[in-house]
Amino acid sequence: MKRYGKLLKQTFRIITTLLVITLVGCSAIVTGDGADKKEIVLDTAGTENTPDIETAEKIEETETEEKPGRVIALSKSNAELWLLAGGSLIATSEDALGLEGVDEDTADLGDMDHVSLEAIAALEPDLLILFSTDPAQKALGEAAEGIGIPVYYTNIDNYADYESVMTDLTKLTGRTDLYETRVADVSEEIEEIIKEVPEGAEEKTYLLLHVSATKSKVEKNDYFASEIFNRLGLRNIAADDSAFDELSLEQIVASDPDYIFVVTRGDEKKALESFDELFKDQPAWESLSAVKNENYYLLSKDLFGLKPNDRWAESYREAFKILYGG
């Protein structure tokens, strides 16, 4: 059998045109250098997520060849995606070391944004999984492809992106059966939860804040958790409001959302101390409708801060309980 990296190079060389996707979410496999450098963009946006025929044929072909067996995924989310697809890892970043399927034989590459090309190359991977939106990982990916290491980029902003990425990865591992249990079944559960939203319920507004020890920011509709609350009948009051680009208590008071949701980043204790000092401890905070009606919630970081992957339905269920009980 041909090795996976060689197969990718041969496949990319015979493709005469690049698929160009202008939709928001996408992932890609990149390999080669110089004149051989090719990037195949895999659609992860839109309502149907119908794969490009050329891309589908390429992935189908890999199923008859040797599957990637020396895979490195940087970040807990990317590592989990590959493991959920039935793959195994030879190395990952330190934040993923606690995942089921990562054992003592899995090399620890440290901080996901400070991994050297030398450390990657020394392990001789046949697939590297990275974020397309992380500048440090994008730079590492470009360097890796330059020495012939195949790179698969992920960018998951919503559930449709998760579906599309898992389609690709389960085809690469040959475990399309896992797509059924970890994507199709999850999709059905999500739809059942959405059906439980009361008909004719008054549309209420919300503000979703990401807070850390050094900064607080408002999440707009391109954040995955915003999609969850939107589909459950709420409206993001900051969706198209540039006034929220710089968060202030005055702007929150002026918009007066029905719900305020907070997700922490980094050290939770320090993040909340900073948030309390800047917002909650101010007299104007008590004037907010969300506060008066006890609709201020600190959300689970695992379900609303990190990409939930196969726990998307759990995130929906938790959000539903907050909004409608049950």
Predicted features by range, described:
Residues P68-A85, L178-L232:
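Basic- and aromatic-lined ligand-binding clefts that recognize polyanionic substrates
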Residues D95-L99, K217-F244:
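Alpha-helical, coiled-coil/dimerization segments enriched in small aliphatic residues
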